[in-house]
Every structure is written in C-alpha cells, then in structure tokens.
A protein has these predicted regions:
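Conserved, structured core segments of small domains
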Residues: 1-118
C-alpha cells in the first residue's frame, strides 16, 4: 500500500533549514531518516518543499479567480516536505511517521494514496 507522509513544521524550523549556517546541521536528522527508508526499500519518492512564503494559493468562486500570495493555511505548522512510501499496512506507515524528525517538533500526516476504481 502506498502512503504519503507530509512533514509539517513550525515556520522557525523551516527558516532554520534555509539558513546557510544552521541548515547543514538541521538537515542531518533528515538525511539519516531518508537513508533508513531507502535502505529498507520503502521510499518511492518525495521532496522538500520551498518555504511557505513562496507559495501562491489560487481559488475560483463564481467563475472569478482569486490569487493569494503565501499559503492558504493560517496555522503554526506548515508543510515542509513529503515522501511516498510503499509498505504492507497503515501500522507500518505510522511507524515510519513516528520516526520522522517532524513528529518531534511539528507533525507528520499519514494519508493513503487513493487509486481510481477499476
């Protein structure tokens, strides 16, 4: 079963990853985590997202397009990245989510990939 793990972090942590001085050390736990998933053969893909302030949100209401700079969500934790994993069960996906560096400082959302009906 495929699952998407979305890594949600406080803005301060996202800024730390982009800081030239703090970034390399901030990325070390992520390198270890991704390496562990790759070694286990469960990782199918994923990426770090650009900082939330680079986002543009588009909505359409009544045929009118509305564009907003920045992320739509007004929360303390914002999506910082994602990975697609292929594991046997939700329980196994939850175990990988628990190991995520985001889980200790923010959250990790686990969502199954929906397949179109046959």
């Amino acid at each position: 079963m495929e699952f998407v793990l979305t890594f949600n972090q406080p803005v301060e942590e996202i800024e730390r990853h982009d800081d030239p001085q703090q970034g390399p050390a901030a990325m070390e736990p992520w390198k270890a985590y991704m390496g562990e998933m790759a070694a286990a053969g469960v990782m199918r893909g994923g990426n770090r997202l650009a900082p939330p302030w680079t986002a543009t949100t588009v909505r359409s209401r009544g045929g009118q397009r509305m564009v907003q700079d920045g992320p739509f969500a007004d929360t303390k934790e914002l999506a910082a990245g994602y990975v697609v994993i292929d594991v046997a069960s939700l329980d196994e996906a939850l175990k990988w989510a628990e190991k995520s560096p985001s889980t200790a400082i923010g959250s990790t959302e686990v969502r199954p990939v929906a397949r179109p009906p046959q």
